[in-house]
Amino acid sequence: MPLSEIDRVVQESARKLLQVSAPPIKYWLMVDTLGMDERDPLVQRTIAECKAYPPRLKLIRTLRKDGTWPISKSRKAAEDAGPGPPVGWTYITMLRNLQLLEDMYTDKGEGFISSALERILSWQKKEGYILGPHHDLFPLPHYNGYAIRNLIIYGMQDDPRVKRLADWLLSIQRHDGGWVIPYQEDVKYLPEYKHMKMQDFMELVRKGDTPKSDSKGFRDVPSCIWTTMMVIRGLARDKEYRRRREILKGADFFLDRFFKANRHEAYYHSEKNWTQFKYPPYFGSGLGALYLLTILGYGPGDERMEKPVRWLLDARHSDGFWWQSDRPHMQKDQWITGFAVDILQRYSKNR
């Protein structure tokens, strides 16, 4: 496709988005997409607007001294009935809100953000991983990818604990370049378990009555598209890791499967997940995949990118915006459009 078409779309949509967007979206659009200098008076004014942005202030205000946010009474009761954090909604809420705050131009020196990051690291095991949030039976690579992303975006990439988490994630990369959810996406496919209900199977895992999950085994089982994407999403936030062959191999894994159904029913089985527009993009989508791929340097020189980029262009509406899939939402549509414009601009620049 002509790169001039992409450049035109970027300029048109960016111009429209600048006119109506919330301060954080405007900031990232000006600095990341349009390359404006932080010292530009317009950028400085936008930063001041970000600092006063009510949703940002609310999240900072409700973050408690211990690094956690309040959760509903029902979720707190369920959490208290189990092993406690990091299992439960406290940890999930921390991960989500930390991402939202960084999106809204927040650094770790504000409020009790440092306490939240330290609390996450306090749950780290000696092997490097963090258990939770769904159970404490085994670590979930996609949530560990989510955790390391938050730690890196707040500038903790050189912390030895963060490096240990990254090393653990890389140590369980599989033969095809991807990752799976242990047990649920490898041992579960053994003949004696494949027809069992997941709940019954997980009870066997809890009792220790199954073979162990093995990232170097089960070579007949392909990795999970979305687990892989979540791990890469975390590690790719660090410039040093972006250059590592393991990261590019993981990116190749999900690029080669763009628009295809995930083999695993445990995590976004349908191919429809590729074409869903949503914000926040927590657990994978075509938009999230393209964002990662362009960050890693994929561009027009890779023919595998052509169909995904064409899909993104074709999904743009006549008003110059991309809309949330389940129902249009003005604020979320602005974020989604910001991501789309940034992806297209970076794709063109990677020529």
Regions found by a protein language model. Name each.
Residues 1-351:
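Preference for long, amphipathic alpha-helical scaffolds in soluble/luminal domains
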